[in-house]
Regions:
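Hydrophobic h-region of N-terminal signal peptides that target proteins for export
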Residues: 12-20
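Formylglycine-dependent sulfatase
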Residues: 2-4, 19-422, 428-449, 453-456, ...
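Sec-dependent signal peptide recognition
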Residues: 3-11
Length: 477
């Protein structure tokens, strides 16, 4: 073999080895795009693959075929602001001082010292955008552009916080609903008919503009929170009235976003997540969703209040058509994204743990031993532990036995006092009909120990306990 041939062979071996090393580095240091689609007040039973037979959701159904469907995914809390704080920070909302739903001109908001998903990814060079509903404080220092987002188009709080609220006057005194572009009010909304379309168009445009760079796109749709609005192209299309029409348009929006990803050749490099902030607002009757087969809805710790439809698609690592039954909570999304993107977590304590090995099939176990269900101002209502769900005595609201609302007008809740500990086996009794606490004393004791440990850390107003680890929200005062 001549020296020339030997040189050529060695050169090719060097090139191949170097290419292999580079490929390995790229797989380790991958920066997949992240798209988080987050609807408002959508029930578990409002998607075809989760049981809806009167609403067509072809794009979400296809997303389940192409990715994983989680049957035990929980929002961080059963109400707007708190839920959003949890999914964006990886913390229980009460850890960071976020409770309930902020009203307009609130002097409280998400503390800028907390690290959001957007800030975590921005530090890795991601372009970041939010199109939709913010609801984590409408003072300038709390707005999305101060919390890691490069771009913002949408409304600062819920779409019903406007002068056309059905209880305007007797209960509320809302001003005009502002529409923001970054930090500027560009319009006040008197009609929301085309808002879903505009949010979708902005999302598609953002994907097109950032096809050559890693990006994080957060799409917190204001719908199907009341008041319901749908564009003409979907009006009257469903078998479930206006509410079903709205869900069909949201499904269309998901399809448009997925199409934009595909048309830009980004399918294998993009993680797409779909879920909702809490269960349906049952007081609104035919303008609310369905959480069946689960009990109750928004504003409660029962399964219907926080168990949400959840889909995740990432062909590179997540097999299609997979169903995952292990419990996961919204607080686990941020650390999961951190793992897959190799992003650095904040030094501050958070509650979430990565569920990435569960999503990819490398594990069958929940990332956490237990999940804790707080509501109102730091009241611990319940705990999910494996297949078990335990509730502590507390007051909750129900529409059972009440006249439901109709056509945009709410019905009146009835308040119920849960007077003793109740325990349910969710594998056998997902509808939480039969209290079996007395038959499982060892389980009750175990969960009480877990709850007491959490109370020491984050407190429990029902027990007059203050936590040692709570952080303050942001304040303008």
């Amino acid at each position: 073999m001549t020296l020339k041939i030997k040189f050529v062979i060695l050169l090719w071996l060097f090139i191949l080895q170097n290419a292999s090393c580079q490929d390995g580095d790229n797989s380790v240091n991958s920066s997949p795009n992240i798209i988080l689609i987050f609807t408002d007040d959508q029930g578990y039973n409002d998607v075809g693959v989760f049981g809806a037979d009167d609403i067509d959701t072809p794009n979400l159904d296809q997303m389940a075929k192409d990715g994983a469907k989680l049957t035990s995914f929980y929002s961080a809390q059963a109400v707007c602001s708190a839920s959003r704080a949890g999914i964006l920070t990886g913390s229980y909302p009460n850890r960071i001082g976020i409770h309930n739903a902020f009203m307009p001109n609130s002097k409280v908001g998400l503390n800028p010292s907390e690290t959001t998903l957007a800030e975590m990814l921005k530090d890795k060079g991601y372009a970041t955008a939010i199109f939709g509903k913010w609801h984590l404080g409408d003072a300038q220092e709390f707005m999305p552009t101060k919390q890691g987002f490069d771009e913002y188009f949408g409304i600062p709080y819920s779409n019903d916080m406007w002068p056309l609220h059905p209880q305007q006057g007797p209960i509320f005194d809302f001003g005009p609903l502002p529409l923001y572009e970054n930090e500027q009010v560009i319009d006040t909304l008197t009609d929301q008919t085309n808002l879903t379309t505009k949010i979708t168009e902005r999302s598609v445009d953002f994907i097109n503009r950032n096809k050559d760079n890693p990006f994080f796109l957060y799409v917190p749709h204001p719908q199907p929170h009341v008041p319901l609005f749908v564009s003409d192209k979907f009006k009257g299309k469903s078998k479930r009235g206006l509410y079903g029409d709205v869900i069909m348009e949201l499904d269309w929006s998901v399809g448009e976003i997925i199409n934009a990803v595909e048309e830009n050749g980004l399918t294998d490099d993009t993680i797409i997540i779909f879920t909702s902030d809490n269960g349906p607002w049952l007081a609104y009757g035919n303008h609310s969703g369905s959480a069946l087969p689960f009990r109750e809805g928004k504003g409660t710790a029962w399964e219907g209040g926080q168990r949400e439809p959840f889909l995740i698609k990432y062909p590179k690592e997540i097999k299609g058509g997979v169903t995952i039954d292990a419990p996961v909570m919204a607080i686990d999304i941020l650390p999961s994204v951190a793992e897959v993107t190799n992003a650095k977590l904040s030094d501050a304590v958070i509650d979430g743990k990565s569920a990435w090995s569960l999503f990819t099939g490398k594990s069958k176990e929940s990332p956490q031993e237990a999940y804790f269900f707080y509501y109102r101002v730091n009241e611990l209502f319940g705990v999910r532990y494996g297949k078990w769900k335990l509730y502590f005595p507390h007051r909750y609201r129900t529409m059972n036995g009440q006249e439901p609302g109709k056509d945009g007008l709410p019905g009146n809740y009835r308040m119920v006092d849960l007077k003793k500990i109740e325990l349910y086996d969710l594998e056998l009794d997902a509808s939480e009909t039969t209290n079996i606490a007395s038959k499982n004393p060892d389980v009750v004791v175990k969960i009480q120990k877990l709850a007491n440990d959490m109370r020491r850390r984050l407190g429990d107003s029902l027990m007059n306990m203050e936590g040692k680890e709570n952080r303050a929200p942001g304040r303008t005062e």
